[in-house]
Each structure stands twice: as C-alpha cells, then as structure tokens.
Curated annotation (Swiss-Prot):
Highest classification ranks of the organism: Bacteria, Pseudomonadati, Pseudomonadota, Gammaproteobacteria, Cellvibrionales
Catalytic activity: Hydrolysis of Ala-|-Gly bond in repressor LexA
Enzyme Commission identifier(s): 3.4.21.88
Quaternary data: Homodimer.
Family to which this protein belongs: Belongs to the peptidase S24 family.
One Pfam family of this chain: LexA_DNA_bind
Protein name, UniProt field: LexA repressor
Length: 200
C-alpha cells in the first residue's frame, strides 16, 4: 500500500481526474496553475516524489509524460474511512466496480457500502452500494454523505438560512435526527447520493 502525503494525494487525484475527463494527463504547468504553485518546477518535484513511491510513472522528454501504473477502470468502492484523511485516499479503496462513472447523473465518483437501515423508507438498505458524486455543494432535501467527527453517515440534509446548525434526517422513524452545530463540530459534506446499487 502506497503512503502519500496530503499534497501528493491531491496531485494524484488531479492527475486521475484530468485523465478521466480529457483522456490525457495534465502538464506540469497545468498542475502548478490549478494547485497554486509558483512554478512548474514545484509541480515537478512533487511528481518525482510520486514516481519514487510508485504512484505514477514519468516519461522523459514529454510535457504530458505522466502515466498511472495499472490504471483501474470503473468506480472506486470506498471502505472504512480513517480519521483525518481524504475519503478517496488510496488506502480507503477496497475495489473497483466495472461501471462507467457517467452511468449516473451527475457522475458517480465513488461507491460506499451502506451500513444500517436508517434510510430504508426511500429504498437505501443495509449492504447496498450508494453511488456518490463528490461535492460539498448540496441543497435542502438532498441525500448526502456527511462526515461527523470522522464517522461517515448517509442522511437527508436540512439547513435553515443563516443558521449555524445542520440537521441530518433519517428515512426511518426508528432513528433520530442528528443535529450538528457547525461552530464546534468536525463536520463535512463528502458528497451527494446519485443512485443505489443493490447487491444480489
């Protein structure tokens, strides 16, 4: 298992996203511009570190000379999420499901195994795979994947305008609403539910 720093993971994710969207890797200058580096040389140093760790392969003499070894196709299936690390960090990915990202709309960036029956009344059951579009831009009523104090949960999002409190509603009367005070809770929206896959 490759251990990457947060910055290295960010660059690797950028390379993967760029290849998925355009079919080819970004240049050093593009990486520097997107991530706010002062020069392409700074991006080059990070790329060399990634290559030393085996996360990428570099092809000399080509401006887009970056290759991902053993590129996996399909949507990553995320397992247990470690505290303080990005949800799509390599160590969280258990497998890849052979489904095109654009099978869902908006596209699914990852799959998450549902644990529990708190959302059963809208057909999200224990053991299902939830297709998730990675974004923190959600609206009232959306089904979201949220992280609270490093626990990941699937709930319906509600927030009143100008209030520092978020409510995460279950779709099962046996479960309680989770209230989160944004001023003191370690809270983040990890993504928006875009579909469910039932395991047979």
């Amino acid at each position: 298992m490759i251990k990457l720093t947060a910055r290295q993971q960010q660059i690797l994710d950028l390379i993967r996203d760029h290849i998925a969207e355009t079919g080819y890797p970004p240049t050093r200058a593009e990486i520097a511009e997107i991530l706010g580096f002062k020069s392409a040389n700074a991006a080059e140093e990070h790329l060399k570190a990634l290559a030393r760790k085996g996360a990428i392969e570099m092809i000399a003499g080509a401006s887009r000379g970056i290759r991902l070894p053993e590129v996996q196709s399909g949507i990553p299936l995320v397992g247990r999420v470690a505290a303080g690390s990005p949800i799509l960090a390599q160590e969280h990915i258990e497998d890849y499901c052979d489904i095109p990202h654009n099978f869902f709309s908006p596209k699914a960036d990852f799959l998450l195994t549902v644990h529990g029956m708190s959302m059963k009344d809208i057909g999200i059951l224990d053991g299902d795979l939830l297709a998730v579009h990675k974004t923190d831009q959600v609206r009232n009523g959306d089904i979201v994947v949220a992280r609270i104090d490093n626990e990941v949960t699937v709930k319906r999002f509600k927030r009143e305008r100008n209030r520092a409190q978020v409510e995460l509603w279950p779709e099962n009367p046996d479960f309680n609403v989770i209230e989160v005070d944004l001023r003191d809770a370690n809270f983040a929206i990890e993504g928006l539910s875009v579909g469910v896959i039932r395991r047979s």
